[in-house]
Amino acid sequence: SENNIISKLEDKTNDLEQLRKDIEEMLKDLMSKKELDWTDKEKMKQLLEKQKEIQEEWEKVQEEQKELQEFMENNELTSEELLKKQEQINKLFEEVIPDEMKKMMEELEKMLGEMPREKMQQMMQDLKNSNKELQEMMDRNLALLEQLKVEKDLNELIDKMNDLSEKLKNMNENNNDSLTSEDAKNQFDELSKELDSIMEKNKGLQ
């Protein structure tokens, strides 16, 4: 569901922010030393491990996003506009972790033991810049997903209101008391609350 994907994306964005701070610290250490010691290399290994974990988790979220898109494409109630937005999100997901970033990670891992300090410093700076871009793209994805969710919720709410209106119409025409006035009022109150909540979320996205 969108909620699940949004929650995971928020987690990954927070992880990336922390990783960028760790890389900043590492860069400061590298600038203050002429040579790297064993501790520096261990720190570097840990940073690379964290980076890999984030990338692997991201790829899992990407799979979930594809499944969500397939579900929406096969659902006849999904509007053309929502489908277009979903496709836009999917394209952004595919762009997030570029091949150059993966290659840079591999190179860093291979050369960790023998890389000169200056070269490592440059590569860490590149990694930091890539992570900044990655974070910005994740933020864009989050904004689009949240917007998509609000629009879907609103469409579902309109369907529920139409359904309730139809039931009331039938009740009046047929004198059918299967849906009492009290029931109708309660359902309408619930839908009004849902609408208020959706409009509040929408206001927060603008």
Question: What do the predicted segments below correspond to?
Answer:
Residues 1-206:
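Feature detects intrinsically disordered, low-complexity acidic/polar segments
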